[in-house]
Each structure stands twice: as structure tokens, then as C-alpha cells.
């Protein structure tokens, strides 16, 4: 894992991508810091951090678009998967390299409350709690970007997918207000989601029987739960969408609350979007080794019989 981490970190620090991301975050922070703290004389650095959360919509797609997509495009992923490195080490090493790049502007941000303290009273506990929350929010966004980069070998598509998903999460609080909170509408929505999941499973495995069975079981279970206790569905859509409201979980950190649930939430999001890459990479590793074995057998066959 250490070798992958050093290799990935070096690639970002020897190219413009890493420096562009660092510059972008620091410039936005400087602009809002000048507006809120220096000009308006607000003593809370949390206002600045809360205002620049949108920076992840632009910065994270740029930072993560090449992390796995470029490996697949250049076919260097096959070299990694056949190397004597664990699959988890590959994924974690790449992810930690991106987190390290993000930690550079975060280290600079830690100096802002110290600068503010020279001109007035600053609540350091509140300020650095917000800094911690902002860092965890960024780590969760980076994990989403790494996952999207693994879905395609085109960097532009990876960046667009990351932007779309992050924008949807960013607007999740507003999106939830468009849905009714009645149990009937929630049940119908979940039924459509189960149908969509069955269709997606069919497109992946091309087995209509298994897809139909999964869909029918899901729909029947949904109907039974609704008949037995329909009240459980009230406001269900809002509860589900709230799980994906990344910015909403960051609000507690900016309100002088050391939110343990928020810390667990951001760590869970980071784990949830990086852990699926491990079995997928493991399957690719097995395919690469099988292909290498077949090529070796073919060379042996040619050396003995072609002559």
C-alpha cells in the first residue's frame, strides 16, 4: 500500500492537477475569509467554511477524475492487479494519496483562526471543530469521486458523473421538499425504485428469471409491510434522502457542535464508496491472472508445435 500511496501522491505533486486543486481551494477560502472576517469583522471562521462547501462540486471532479479512469485507459491497471500488492492496498493507497493532497490546503486553513486571534477574540474550539467537519466532508466527497472514476476509463465522463452526484447530494435538502410525506406516495416511490433495481440487475446479469424473482419478492414484501403498518412509510422519502444530505450533516460542525454522529456518518460514506472497489478489483485481478496464464500456455504451445 505504501508504494501505491507514494506513487499516486508523486503523480499529483509532479503534475498541475494537485496544485490546481490546492490553489482553487485556497483562493476561494481567501476570498470568503477577506469578505467575512477581514471586511465584515465576523469572529467566526465557520461562516467561511460553510460558504465554500460548493468548492467540492468543482474541485473534487478535477482531482479524482484520473485516479482510476486513467489506469484503465492506459491499461496500467492490469500491471497493478498482477503486482504483489493487495487489492485493498491499491484502493486505500490511491484514496489516501488524494486525501493527503486535500490535507495541504486544510493545513493552511488551520492558520486562519490564529490570524484572527491577533485582531480579536476567537473561539478556537468552535473554529477547529468546523475545520474537522470540513475535512471529513471533503474526504467523503473524494471517496465518491474515486468510486465514479472506477466506473469508466474516460476522465471527462468520470468528472461529469462526480459533479452530477455531488450536486444531487448538495441539493438533497431541496429535492426532498418536492416529495409528499404521505405513506401511499412513499410506498409507490419505493415500489418504482424496486422495479428500477430489478431492471438494473437484469442489465448486469442478463438473467430475466433471477431479476424477476428479486423484483417480485421486493414488491410483495413492500405491500405486506404497507398493509400491516402503513404509518412506517410516512416521511420515508425524506428520511432516505436525508441520508445522502452531506452538507446537512456538516451544519452541526459549523454550529459549535462536536457531532459524533456526523463523524461516523462521513467515515461511513467514505468507507461505503471505497469498499465496493475492492471486490471489483479482486475480480479484475483474477481475470488478469487467468489471461496471463492463458498467454503463458499459448507461448509454450507455440514454442513446441509451431516449429
Feature locations, PLM:
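Hydrophobic alpha-helical transmembrane segments
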Residues: 1-82, 105-111, 203-206, 214, ...
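Alpha-helical membrane-protein architecture signal
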Residues: 2-6, 88, 92, 96, ...
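Alpha-helical transmembrane segments and their helix-entry boundary regions
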Residues: 18-19, 90, 157-159, 263
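Secretory targeting signals
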Residues: 29-36, 43-46, 50-55, 97-162, ...
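Terminal transmembrane helical anchor/hairpin motif
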Residues: 39-42, 158-161, 165-280, 285-287
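Helix-loop-helix units of permease transmembrane domains in multi-pass membrane transporters
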Residues: 67-97
